[in-house]
From Swiss-Prot:
This is Protein FAM131B. Residues 1-22, 221-332 are annotated as: Disordered. Residues 323-332 have a biased composition (Acidic residues). It comes from Rattus norvegicus (Rat). Signal peptide: none annotated. It comes from the Eukaryota. The modification Phosphothreonine is found at residue 316. The modification Phosphoserine is found at residues 47, 114, 117, 295, 297, 313, 317-318, 322. InterPro entries: FAM131. Residues 272-281, 288-302 have a biased composition (Basic and acidic residues). Belongs to the FAM131 family. Keywords: Phosphoprotein. The keyword Phosphoprotein applies. The keyword Phosphoprotein applies.
Length: 332
């Protein structure tokens, strides 16, 4: 009786979940193990939720299959017919007929399409699909070919740029070698020949700051001077070059003029007073030629100027050594 009363109580209070829980908790105290078998049908009934989900899923798949068979296929055929009409009527193209006959042409085309059999309609549908696929495939192939051409152009431009840079570097190196070759021979050749423009006092004026810096920055007589002026051998001993004869060495900086005149027998310029007494026409011409050649000569780098100054100092030191040898011979 207790079990039946508890079952009836639970059935009466079933709409309220909280009350059923309290009833179950209250009745569970008085329930025995034999009476628990009456709860199993409820648990089994609650476990059918998975079965309901599977049924809903299967029913949904069945409904979707039926919709596909009865709704989707006819709709696809209808869309295909619309596509056939678009292809048949030639929409998107320039009208080849007059506007007043357009309605008649559309009606005629519609009647002609409707008169086609199902096989002809299917054939036209497949032809339209194949045409669209062919157009899209051709477009993709064109794009891929354009991408390939761009890649090939870029790949060909890279080695061209590398070759251009290599050739440019080789050209610059050859130009540097050509520029250094004549400059290496300038101090030895022109200083030994007495053509280094240091004999005139005008070359060392305080106003010309570029010539005061060092003898290496002085102007050399280049090939243009050989063409415009007579050579040292043609001038002879009577005509001095840069204020001195061809056999006489140029004056050395820092050497006493009296000692140099006694040892080498060289008549050095005593100053601007003696230069004013004799005619200055040849010296002025030579100074003008030196300055013109200096303006035409290329600017030297600091490294090149230091190298040239060292070479000039070597030449001058060799000249001092030769003067010492001559002095020793004269004393003996």
């Amino acid at each position: 009786m207790d079990s039946t009363s508890s079952l009836h109580g639970s059935s009466l209070h079933r709409p309220s979940t909280e009350q059923t829980r309290t009833d179950f908790s209250w009745d569970g105290i008085n329930l025995s193990m034999e009476d628990t078998t009456s709860i199993l049908p409820k648990l089994k009934r609650n476990s059918n939720a998975y079965g309901i989900g599977a049924l809903a899923k299967s029913s949904f798949s069945g409904i979707s299959r039926s919709m596909k068979d009865h709704v989707t296929k006819p709709t696809a055929m209808g869309q295909g017919r619309v596509a056939h009409m678009i292809e048949w009527q030639g929409w998107g193209k320039a009208p080849a007929i007059q506007p007043q006959h357009s309605h008649e042409a559309v009606r005629r085309d519609t009647d002609a399409y409707s008169d086609l059999s199902d096989g002809e309609k299917e054939a036209r549908f497949l032809a339209g699909v194949m045409e669209q696929f062919a157009i899209s495939e051709a477009t993709l192939m064109a794009w891929s070919s354009m991408d390939g051409e761009d890649m090939s152009v870029n790949s060909t431009q890279e080695p061209l740029d590398c070759n251009y840079s290599d050739n440019y570097q080789e050209l610059m190196e050859s130009q540097d070698a050509l520029a250094q070759a004549p400059m290496d021979g300038w101090p030895h050749s022109y200083v030994s020949q007495g053509m280094y423009c240091l004999g005139s006092s005008d070359a060392w004026e305080a106003s010309d700051q570029s010539l005061i810096a060092s003898p290496a920055t002085g102007s050399y007589l280049g090939p243009a001077f050989d063409d415009s002026q007579p050579s040292l051998h043609d001038m002879g001993p009577s005509q001095p070059a840069s204020g001195y004869s061809a056999q006489e060495p140029p004056p050395l900086l820092g050497v006493d003029t009296d000692w140099a005149s006694e040892v080498g027998g060289v008549e050095l310029a005593r100053g601007p007073v003696e230069e004013e007494k004799r005619p200055l026409a040849p010296e002025e011409e030579e100074d003008a030629g030196c300055r013109d050649l200096e303006s035409l000569s290329p600017r030297e780098d600091p490294e090149m100027s230091t190298a040239l100054s060292r070479k000039v100092s070597d030449v001058t030191s060799s000249g001092v050594q030769s003067f010492d040898e001559e002095e020793g011979d004269a004393n003996n």
